[in-house]
């Protein structure tokens, strides 16, 4: 009952401080994160729920993102577009970890199912849990103190009294002008209240906070009511046993074919470099090399991970260790090639917010490629480590003043004569005019 009631002001503060932060633009997000963490932790302790070992990591990442917002605002470029969803994702993951609702007991390869449970199954499956909890507590309290008959008697008494007073007021207003004027004053006050913009604004926030609070309490309360996650690792393993339809020969043939294509690609790349090395590359040719195919290389890495995941979940047998090592080695090579392209391009054309984002994407995929290669020889929780690397690196990047860093680098290159002119589009995107005015 207590936690159900506390969710009402907490949801209202989320609307005013996070979703529509006009009232608390600087500190609403970190304050809500701190209050919600305390709320979840106290509720979990009251339910005697053991937290996952990774819970502090998600708490730190979530709070760091919350604190970074009032310091630097949203980062420019795609990175800023991802901050808002990431902040909510970390919040949901913290709740799941603290309440013991992760499918594997920890983050891992079933993370998509955890996201489905955290955003859909638990909150919407328990959407009316708060209302039921409050009404049940009130009904029990009233029954214990007055009994059902007395409650009904009070309701009937109040209705009859209001009806009689209304009739009497109308008759007396017709009998005396001053009494009628008093009634008109009360009516005018009520109309002014209902037509007051501030009152309507507060009322709308209160009404909007009701479904928000129902969702939040459904997530927390629904997690604490369950003894096991909506989908467990054992259930997934049992289902996947019936889905292992890919023969080993098919998997081996497909991976060997991909390795052949990759080997041919690197042979062509090496031939191009050997042919061009004696002649040298001018700046336009170097820039063309750097920019061409960067995102395609990242897509190749994603393709490799999809192939490995498909074999892991749907293959009847794992790949031979040597073939798996070669395939994962190509992934590391693609990541290294993409890193070289990005480094050359940044050296030639300076930093932009999008290149910061590209560097982060490349870093995460490179870490995944290395973990996949290590996992061939040593059983490590590669998916868990990859998720941690993505979350921590994204948080650290959001805690850096990317806007000022981009401005400083571009101005330094211009003053040193490296760039003939400033890229005003990039500078304006990073708020250079505002910085100069200050």
Where on the chain are the PLM-derived regions?
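Membrane-embedded alpha-helical segments of integral membrane proteins
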Residues: 326-376
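Terminal, non-globular segments
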Residues: 83-88, 199-238, 242, 251, ...
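Hydrophobic alpha-helical transmembrane segments in integral membrane proteins
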Residues: 395-420
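Short aromatic-rich membrane-water interface segments that cap or initiate transmembrane helices
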Residues: 190-207, 282-302, 351-361
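Internal/C-terminal transmembrane anchor helices
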Residues: 259, 380-403
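Membrane-interfacial entry segments at the cytosolic side of transmembrane helices
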Residues: 149-155, 317-322, 377-391
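Membrane-helix interface motif
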Residues: 170-187, 264-280, 336-344
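Transmembrane-helix bundle segments that line or gate the permeation/cavity pathway
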Residues: 15-23, 27-181, 204-227
């Amino acid at each position: 009952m207590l936690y159900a009631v506390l969710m009402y002001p907490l949801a209202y503060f989320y609307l005013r401080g996070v979703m529509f932060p006009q009232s608390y633009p600087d500190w609403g997000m970190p304050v809500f994160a701190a209050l919600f963490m305390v709320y979840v932790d106290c509720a979990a302790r009251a339910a005697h729920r053991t937290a996952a070992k990774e819970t502090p990591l998600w708490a730190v990442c979530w709070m760091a993102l919350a604190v970074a917002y009032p310091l630097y605002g949203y980062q420019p470029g795609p990175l800023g577009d991802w901050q808002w969803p990431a902040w909510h994702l970390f919040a949901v993951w913290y709740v799941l970890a603290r309440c013991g609702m992760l499918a594997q007991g920890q983050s891992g390869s079933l993370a998509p199912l955890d996201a489905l449970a955290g955003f859909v199954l638990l909150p919407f499956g328990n959407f009316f849990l708060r209302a039921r909890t409050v009404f049940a507590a009130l009904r029990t309290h009233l029954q214990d103190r007055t009994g059902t008959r007395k409650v009904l008697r009070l309701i009937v008494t109040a209705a009859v009294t209001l009806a009689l007073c209304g009739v009497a007021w109308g008759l007396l207003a017709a009998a005396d002008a001053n009494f009628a004027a008093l009634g008109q004053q009360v009516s005018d006050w009520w109309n002014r209240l209902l037509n007051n913009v501030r009152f309507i604004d507060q009322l709308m926030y209160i009404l909007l906070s009701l479904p928000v609070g129902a969702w939040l309490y459904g997530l927390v309360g629904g997690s604490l009511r369950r003894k096991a996650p909506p989908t467990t690792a054992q259930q997934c393993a049992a289902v996947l046993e019936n889905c292992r339809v890919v023969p080993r020969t098919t998997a081996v043939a497909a991976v060997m074919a991909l390795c052949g294509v990759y080997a041919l690609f690197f042979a062509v790349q090496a031939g191009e470099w050997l042919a061009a090395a004696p002649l040298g590359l001018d700046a336009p040719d170097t820039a063309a090399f750097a920019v061409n195919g960067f995102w395609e290389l990242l897509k190749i890495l994603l393709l490799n991970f999809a192939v490995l995941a498909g074999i892991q979940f749907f293959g009847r047998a794992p790949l031979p260790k040597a073939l798996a090592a070669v395939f994962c080695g190509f992934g590391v090579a693609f990541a290294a090639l993409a890193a070289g392209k990005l480094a050359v391009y940044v050296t030639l054309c300076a930093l932009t917010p999008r290149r910061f984002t590209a560097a982060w994407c490349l870093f995460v995929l490179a870490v995944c490629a290395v973990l996949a290669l290590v996992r061939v020889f040593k059983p490590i929780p590669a998916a868990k480590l990859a998720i941690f690397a993505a979350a921590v690196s994204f948080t650290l990047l959001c805690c850096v003043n990317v806007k000022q860093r981009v401005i400083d680098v571009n101005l330094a290159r211009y003053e040193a004569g490296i760039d003939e002119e400033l890229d005003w589009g990039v500078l304006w995107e990073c708020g250079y005019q505002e910085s100069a005015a200050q």
